[in-house]
A protein has these predicted regions:
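Bacterial N-terminal signal peptides
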Residues: 20-31
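Feature recognizes metal-dependent phosphohydrolase scaffolds
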Residues: 32-454
Length: 454
């Protein structure tokens, strides 16, 4: 018997039973293959919604999540199989960073249960808080961590600080600027909630442990998402390697800080600037004392002081780079094309730099989307506003605001009606896509129909 379109498989007499078995397996495999129905072509990718910097603006964050159709009125996930990407900077400046992180942590679980996904990426402010760079943490931020035991903890920490000062006279003499001398000064710089915030953002803290599990960059359906951007100098670095390096740097920071605490060089609540000053002074004090060198200890000190060269804190690193906003079209277009070719990607989506007019800004032939629109409007007054970027079917990019939504790039890759690439409202100018920008109901993601405003 000869299968349709196939060859006759013969087992010659005298051959081993094994040959017969193998031939039978081949026949069965061919028959099963014929019996399988044809595979349906893969459908378009599930929707992706990206939101940029939040900076503790919980209320507007909730509003834009609802507007984009990701959560319901009780703030539970309703986005189905949608992927929600937040490109970093949940923290600092605004009044409710804890509420923002609590919501993100809840949505991660709820989205996964519904077949969707929440991708929370690190921004420079997450890295700063984990490393104790507290320049943008406000008294209101600290106060949100305070509880009934905060005053007692403050007093105990101050006593520990006084004891430390008394034991480090030679070191303190080498400080370029004196540390706090009085209890009043110390309390002013360590308000209620300060100690609790440091613990919560530490490696074993509720938020610190969660943040340390996050990546800095993600690629989804050919679109690369991150906080700042990829500088051409790092184009040879794979995205996975980038994420690993930043995670390793934060781990190294935590380990060095723990070692320095055990050596009684620093206290757990010292901020980054204080640690740097103390270690620099310690190096000078040891040289002046001409004591035998403790090589292991000096190596740890030097390692810590070199953290400014780390990828996670460099100004051209993925958490800090602002080139996509600052480059001219002539300078940036070829650079972006090379980056996308290198990573076999189609677009880049970044936050970090607030866009004028509070509008999502496409650049370089609509290959880059700048999505930080200054959500914390009280800080970025008068232009700041909440926004989201919907990516539909991997080809249609839509800017979503609380009062309207605007198609920035359609499925053919051409410019929307009303302007050439880079010349629509997303660019922050006065151009318009149409006389009546499309407005969709708040509970529809990537809807095919639009309702014009009345």
């Amino acid at each position: 018997m000869q299968p349709r379109g196939g060859k006759i498989v013969r087992v010659r007499a005298g051959k081993s039973p094994r040959a017969f078995v193998l031939a039978s397996v081949v026949l069965v495999s061919v028959a099963l293959a014929w019996g399988k129905p044809a595979k349906a072509p893969a459908g378009p990718p599930e929707p992706v919604v990206a939101i940029g910097d939040v900076h503790g603006d919980y209320d507007d964050f909730v509003s834009i999540l609802r507007r984009a159709g990701l959560i319901d009125e009780q703030n539970h996930w309703k986005g189905g199989k949608t992927t929600f990407v937040q490109t970093g900077d949940l923290l600092d400046r605004g009044p409710k960073p804890r509420e923002v992180m609590d919501l993100m942590m809840a949505l991660e679980k709820e989205a996964a249960q519904a077949g969707g996904r929440v991708v929370s990426l690190l921004g420079n402010h997450e890295a700063m808080n984990m490393m104790g760079d507290l320049r943008y943490v406000t008294p209101v931020n600290f106060a949100s961590y305070a509880d009934g035991q905060s005053e007692q903890r403050q007093k105990a920490a101050y006593e520990e600080y006084v004891k430390w000062r008394n034991g480090h006279a030679s070191l303190l003499a080498e400080l370029p600027q004196p540390m706090e001398l009085t209890e009043t000064e110390w309390m002013a710089r360590h308000p209620a909630g300060f100690l609790e915030q440091r613990e919560a953002l530490g490696p074993k803290g509720e938020y610190g442990e969660w943040l340390r599990g996050h990546d800095a960059v993600a690629e989804i359906d050919g679109v690369i998402f991150l906080h700042g951007g990829i500088h051409p100098d790092f184009a040879s670095t794979k995205l996975d390697a980038m994420n690993k390096q930043i995670r390793d740097e934060i781990k190294a920071f935590d380990a060095s800080k723990e070692y320095l605490q055990k050596e009684n060089l620093i206290l757990p609540f010292f901020n980054l600037q204080e640690i740097n000053s103390v270690l620099q002074a310690e190096v000078v004090a040891e040289l002046k004392a001409r004591v035998p060198a403790n090589d292991a200890r000096q190596a740890k000190i030097v390692e810590f002081l070199r953290h400014g060269d780390w990828l996670s804190v460099r100004v051209n690193g993925p958490l800090w780079f602002r080139g996509y906003d600052q480059w001219s079209d002539e300078e940036g277009a070829p650079q972006v094309s090379k980056l996308l070719e290198r990573y076999k990607a189609t677009h880049l989506v970044v936050g970090h730099t607030v866009q004028k007019g509070g509008r999502i800004r496409p650049r370089f032939g609509d290959k880059v989307f700048l999505i930080d629109t200054g959500m914390l409007s009280s800080y970025y007054y008068p232009d700041g506003k909440a926004s989201a970027l919907e990516i539909c079917g991997g080809a249609k990019f839509v800017a979503v605001y609380l009062d309207q939504q605007v198609v920035l790039l359609d499925s053919t890759g051409s410019a929307p009606k009303g302007g050439a690439p880079g010349e629509h409202p997303g660019a922050g100018d006065a151009a318009t896509v149409s006389e009546k920008p499309a407005v969709l109901p708040a509970d529809r993601i990537c809807s095919a129909t639009a309702v014009a405003p009345q």
